[in-house]
Amino acid sequence: MQLKATDEQILQALKNAKGIRAAAANALGINERTLMARINKMRARGYSVPDSTYRQPIAAIDHGDYEFTPLPDDDVPIEELIEQRKRKFLHKQEHEEASKLIPIKVKIPGAVGILHFGDPHVDDDGCDIAAIERHTALVNATEGLFAANVGDTTNNWTGRLARLYADQTTSAAQAWKIAEWFIKRCKWLYMIGGNHDLWSGAGDPLRWIAKQQDALYKSSEARIALRFPNGLEVRVNARHDHAGSSIWNPAHGPMKAAIMGTRDHLYVAGHKHESAYSVLKDPISGITMHACKVASYKIYDRYAKDRGFRDNSLSPCALTTINPSLPPEHPDLVKVFWEPTEGAEYLRFLRRKPV
């Protein structure tokens, strides 16, 4: 990629591209806006810069008694549109391929932990905001402990559900203030958008708040590979919810993903405000796979009460520890704690041990 194209190179690129700005910019290795700025400067200096050959002169239409010239099309020519779609696909492809497994380099030696926050719903009157305050403080006070969020940060009532703001004392504007306070409380290893969050559509405010915190935010799934200094890799597959359900086994979704999917070390999901856990062995690689569902900080839920859903919450969160000093196939490489203070104490114990 050249740093600066000459005027002659720009003219030749436009000629080769038959005047298509997007194609010429791509050939020159500059963005289209930069190319247009250069073209305007060249025209101001007297250069004759060709228009797109695809913008054919508009012929007048003769109706006998009168004629008129049709208006120019208000959209880009099809050839430029196709070039734009090609570039958009390449951007999409680059993002999707990179998202299949996101590498995260762990820079500190020894054991680490992840506190997976269940559905926060921080603006709901039934949310235990004091517990959120304690648990974010625990993350900040514990060396090697990272925070993670499985989604539904706020109620985010939209559409016909917007009427439900009348049933809570927190306004929509206040909800985003609390969400920002929550996200800025600690550093996040990953953040997932829940179904409530995604009701915002493409303009999801959480995406921008997370970006300000340099947090990894994914709207549906974050599959990450924690790579430790000793070469060990531990994979975490986090979703707001894994496909599949069973009245007999609330951990069915993440278990199904483990057995029929990517064979990662840890699967974590939220969504249904229930705690569940199952452990499996991958017979091929020998690793132990942990399938977890975390509940919610929305302790008192009128919807659940009205529908007769039972209380299946062990804790609003789960804390998992990873001990990289153990072999990859060791069954205790990953441990799950439902009481975060107990998990943090165990993590401190592991970190005191010689690496």
What are these regions (language model features)?
Residues 114-123, 165, 236, 240-242:
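Short, basic, glycine/proline-bearing loop/turn elements
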Residues 52-73, 317, 333-355:
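Metal-centered catalytic cores of metalloenzymes
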Residues 1-113:
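Acidic, histidine-bearing metal-coordination/catalytic regions of metal-dependent phosphoesterases
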Residues 114-116, 147-149, 191, 237, ...:
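Residue-level marker for buried hydrophobic side chains located in beta-strands
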